Each structure stands twice: as structure tokens, then as C-alpha cells.
From Swiss-Prot:
PANTHER family: UPF0210 PROTEIN MJ1665, UPF0210 PROTEIN SPR0218. Belongs to the UPF0210 family. Homodimer. It comes from Streptococcus gordonii (strain Challis / ATCC 35105 / BCRC 15272 / CH1 / DL1 / V288). Pfam families: DUF711. InterPro entries: UPF0210. This is UPF0210 protein SGO_0390.
Amino acid sequence: MDIRQVTETIAMIEEQNFDIRTITVGISLLDCIDTDINRAAEKVYQKITTKAKNLVAVGDEIAAELGIPIVNKRVSVTPISLIGAATDAKDYIPLAKALDRAAKEIGVDFIGGFSALVQKGYQKGDEILINSIPKALAETDKVCSSVNIGSTKTGINMTAVADMGRIIKETAQLSDMGAAKLVVFANAVEDNPFMAGAFHGVGEADVVINVGVSGPGVVKRALEKVRGESFDVVAETVKKTAFKITRIGQLVGQMASERLGVKFGIVDLSLAPTPAVGDSVARVLEEMGLETVGTHGTTAALALLNDQVKKGGVMACNQVGGLSGAFIPVSEDEGMIAAVQNGSLNLEKLEAMTAICSVGLDMIAIPEATPAETIAAMIADEAAIGVINQKTTAVRIIPKGKEGDMIEFGGLLGTAPVMKVNQASSAAFIARGGQIPAPIHSFKN
């Protein structure tokens, strides 16, 4: 490595907000299954506090050694609906509290996996878990929840979609932060290091470490140097920058894997913003020539960014996975917040952008008077984009306040303007229930 590359890396960290967003340890809880929920909860607590006890110390050690901030240390676990199903419990709050207690004991920021996979229907534990979500998120601090309601192979479980509209409303009513820790997916992935949607898939190894990087500020600075150049130059610039970012992510992942004695999983190639100025995906898109995000051309700019980040990342790391796409969470991106406030970015445009990025309607505040059926219909629209396009899509929306209010979440979750929602009813559509069948192009065997 020559001196120019060293100074480049220093600039990325000190001036351009580059960091490792998260190192996430995925832990299988299948060996914690027990017919008694309290015994299962104790086994869950013991396994997490044993397998991830050194995660925070190792993360801090690597950050100090390399001089690269590692912002979050997190844990993801096997979907809890699978663990709870063996019991006769009427709710899974004891398991949620065991997760929360374990997370606090080892000092991680969040723990994900209070989850259910219901893309083709409910099993015994699924419905119980889903109905436990509002109370579980209200009574814990670090637990995150996710529900997969559709996939390209199975279609969309519209009964679950309807239920999740109601659950999101109830969750927002019971706690200020609950809905910000709840994601509804189509085509959820098993190795996602990012919250709130992380869970540890049943096909994964017993314990795995996955890494998520963050570098929108680095990409923006690189694009500032090629203003006025053709899209060929823009694409090459993004690709080379993504290579550097991902290379560092892989290094951190491998170091953490060796020191913790666990398998290295993947680097997630997602560009994840924060509310800090200079750390915005929206500003990257504007640097390509858009006056403001949300105007015509936004989806095309996002497509270029997303694709070139993947191309550069795949060259840098032979194990990539997770969501691997640009995140466009409104509350967590100062450029997105500004675009909503100036009227150029609305829900409909964000839905269009979902066809490109990983998570579409993400960290969006909507009026608390929005009916549960309308929320369910938003989930159905996002799921349809994912199912038809064979990609992950998700919804994380917070029904709070009135249109035009500002909702403060604090920290990395930022601030969200309450956005306008279409007032026409979708109630009769959602009331049908049942399954939207899988698309014809999913039939490949």
C-alpha cells in the first residue's frame, strides 16, 4: 500500500464519515428449544451471553487498532417463533425479555430475531409471536422484530399483511420507539447484519459474524471530483470507491472472526446513511446532477449507484450477502428529510425507488390516524415489487402525530417529517385475506 492510499483512507475516516456500521454475530438458538418457556428463555440467555460475550471488547479493540470507527455491535438470532412453538405459552414475552437481558449483559446495541417467517401461512408459533410483538417491543429496550410476509417462490400472504397493518398500529400506540424496531419483509435474507430486520437463518452455521459498512460520504466526495463527466466515468468512480469501502469491511470481518473464534459470514454491500451532514445517500444522488432527491431522474440515479456499489463490492470480497443495496431511510438521512420538507419527495416516489434499493418505505412517519388497512396496503405494494422483481423489499413505518409534524427518534434513527398518505380506502382489498400466488417466472424447477 503506497502513501497515497494511506492518506486516502485517513481522509475517508476523518473527513467523509466512513465507518463500519455494524459487526453482527448471528447465533442459532435451535438447541435452546424446550417445552417450558421459562427454561427455553434461560437457555437462550445462556447461549447468547456465552457465544457473544467478547463481541463488544473485540469490536472496540479492532476499531482502536485500525483507527476505523465500528459504530454498532449487534446480535441476531434464530426466528423466535421457531423456539416458542415447542411451548404451550400464550405469548412469547419471556423470550423477548431473555433476549433483552442478554443484550444488556454483553453490551450490544440491538438484538434482532423476534421474528416469524409466514410467507406461505401460519404455523403454531407464528401467530402467537406476531400478536406478542407490540408488548414485546414496549417492554424491552434492545429487541428488534421482523416478519417475512412474502417471497418470489411463494407469493404474498395477504392474511399476514392485514395482521401486520394492525400490529404496526398497536406497536406505535404502546411505545414511542416500538415501530422503529419492527420491519415487514418480502424475500427476507438470512444473513442480514442490519437492524431492525436481522435474524439468523436456519441454514446458517451455529455462530457467524456478518459486517455492514457505511460510506455515502466517501462516494459523494469521489463524485465531486468528476462533476460534469459522463455516466461512464460516474459509474467507474462509484465502483472503485465501493471496492475500497468493502475491502475494509472484509478486513474487519476477518479480524473479528479470528479473535472471536467464529465463522466469517458476509459483508453487506449496503450504503447506509446517518442523520449527520456528509453521510447522506440523498446527497450522493444529488451530486449526480439532481436539484433535489425526488425529482425526475432520482430512480435512474439510484439504479446506477446501487449497481456500481455491488460491482465494486463483489470484486473486493468473495463473501457478500445481506441486503446489499442503498438504504433510503427518511429519518436517518438529512438529505431525504430536506427533500420531504421541500415537497419534492413523497411516498409514491419512495415506492418507485423500492424497485432499486433494499428497503423502500424505511423509517417513514405517517399520520397516526392512518387506518390499519392503509398500512397493510402499503406493505402489500412494497411486497409486490419485491416478489415480482425477485429482490428484498421491506416496510418500516411509524404512525405518529399529524401530517407536517416532526417526530424525533434520536441517535442513528434521526428525525422524520410526518408524510402525507393517500386518503382513499383500501379496506375492502385488504379484507379479502388469503394468498396472492407466486409470479409465473418463479416457477423454475
